[in-house]
Amino acid sequence: MAYFLPNKSLSKEVVQLIEQQLTFTPVQGFNPSKWTRKEAKTIKCYTKVNDGVYLPYIWSSINFNFCPNIDIDYPMQEMIFTGELRENQIAIMQEVQIQLDKTGCTTLDLPPGTGKTILGAYIASLYGLLTVVLCNRLTVARQWVKTFHDNTDASVYMVGETSDSDTPNVLICMQERVCKLPREYREQVGLLIIDEAHTLCTESGVPALLGFTPKYIVVETATLERDDEMHCIMHSIAGTESVSREIIKPFKVIKVLTGVSPDRVMGKNGYTNYVQLVKDTWQNERRQNIIMSIIKDNANRKTLVLSSSVEYSKLLCASLLELDITADYLCGNKKSYQDSQVLVGTTGKIGTGFDPANFCSTYKGVPFDLLIMACSIKKNSTLQQNVGRIFR
C-alpha cells in the first residue's frame, strides 16, 4: 500500500529522508556452505517512476503528518457476503473495523485455521471497494478465488487468466503479475489484502506492495516476523497494530529418536555436503520403517507427512500403498490428490496456506490430526506454518 508523492514535492531534504529511512539491510544468518560472507544487499522500500515516487503508507502518514490517499474518489462496488462467520471470527471483525476506521490498516496476526481467507472476503464485502488480493503462490491464489465464489456474489478475476466479466469486483493477483494491471486501474483499487505477507517482504516484493494506492490495507499472516528482520517493510506500509490470537487448541509434540546417524560426506569447501546428508537420511531403511510403523499404529488418525523431497514423498506414498494403506501424495507439479488416510507432501507445496478442500475433489471434511515432520526445518516461521496444517 503506497502513497504517491509527485516530483514537485520531492525536495532535497525529502529525498534524503526517504533514502535514509527506507533503505533496509537484511540481517544475514551464518551459511557454512559459502567460502566468505558477502555484504548483504540493501532493499529500497520505495518505487521511483517518471513523475514521482511511491512510498509506504504508514511511513508517509507519520513523516508527512496527514492521512494519505484521503482525497482519492474510489469507485464503489456492490458485493454481498453470503457465507457465515463463526463466533470467534465475529469478535475478530469488531477489532478489525476499529483499526481500519482509525488508521486504514490492520494486520491479521492469526494462527493457521482461524479463517483469514474468509475474513478477507467478508471485509471486501463490508467496505464495498474494488479489491485486490496480493499473494505469491498460485495454490493460495486459487484458494482465494474459491473462497470468494463460495461466500460472496462478487465477480472475481485471477490476473493473467481469462475473465468471465469485464467489470470484476475482486482481483486475485500474483506478486509478479501486478505489472499486467495498468497504472490507471491500480489507482482505483480501494482495498488491498496482502496474504502470507511475510513472503512478500523481499526486494522483489516491494514493487508489488507499493503498486497500489488504496484507502484500506489488510495484512494477513500467522508468521510476520522474519529471521532477516525484513518484516520492517510491512511495518512501514501497514504499521504495527494488529489483531492477534494465540493457538488455543491443545496438541502434543513427540520427539522420536530413530538412532539413525548417516555418514557425513564432506564437500570441497570443507563443510558437510548437506544435500547428500539429507538424501542419505531419508533413504535409510530403519528410519523409513519407523515412519511407516507410526502410520500403521495410528490407523484411526488422518495423517499428514511433510518432507523436503519430492522423490521421498513419492517413495513413501508407494510404500504405504504396498501395505494396503490408502495414501496419496502432493508435490512437484501435481495439483490435486484423493482423500486418503495418509497424505505425503513437501513443505514447499503444502507447508504454507494449504487447505484440503481446495486440492481434493473427494474431500470428506475430516481434517488431519496427526502430523509427521520427516525433515529438518531451519526457520521458526516455517515450522509454525507447517504445524498449522493440522489446526484447520
Model-derived features: where do they sit?
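Conserved helicase ATPase core of P-loop NTP-dependent helicases/translocases
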Residues: 142, 156-166, 304, 311-358
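Conserved Walker A/P-loop ATP-binding site and its immediately adjacent core
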Residues: 117-119, 126-150, 308-313
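Walker A/P-loop
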Residues: 102-124
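Conserved interdomain hinge at the start of the Helicase C-terminal
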Residues: 124, 269-308, 315-319
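Conserved RecA-like P-loop NTPase helicase motor core
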Residues: 179-182, 223, 331-392
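Conserved pre-motif I regulatory segment
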Residues: 68-107
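Conserved helix/coil segment N-terminal to the catalytic DExD/H
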Residues: 161-191, 202-207, 357
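Post-DEXD/H (motif II) to motif III coupling segment of the RecA-like Helicase ATP-binding lobe
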Residues: 190-191, 198-254
